[in-house]
């Protein structure tokens, strides 16, 4: 999963993102609801603001790779989900790591399917670079 670890690293260190994500821990020992996973952990609540990161495009086998990831920005209201998605895109867009760069686009908000769901504003992160 080229880029997943790097996306996670940036988001866990960005104060703008962390200010909007639920902290289930304490000030001394924070536990922010950010995970590299396709499905949210079962312990996370529908009322929380959360982020999940996963590779959503195929692996590139060439020397130059171009791989898409999805960052799901979920929250109890549409406005909170949009604000979180904007913060994620701002934190990641045009960030460079060794041999890779991120380009972001904020997708349309997906409304809750039912009362057990919340709003999701996905961010597509295009990870480009050389191996």
Model-derived regions: residue spans:
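A generic structural signal for short, solvent-exposed coil/turn residues
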Residues: 26, 43-45, 63, 98, ...
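Mid-chain, well-packed structural core segment of small domains
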Residues: 70-91
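Short, surface-exposed, polar/charged, turn-prone segments marking secondary-structure boundaries
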Residues: 79-84, 98-101, 130
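Short, charged interaction patches at domain edges and termini
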Residues: 1-13, 54-66, 100-131
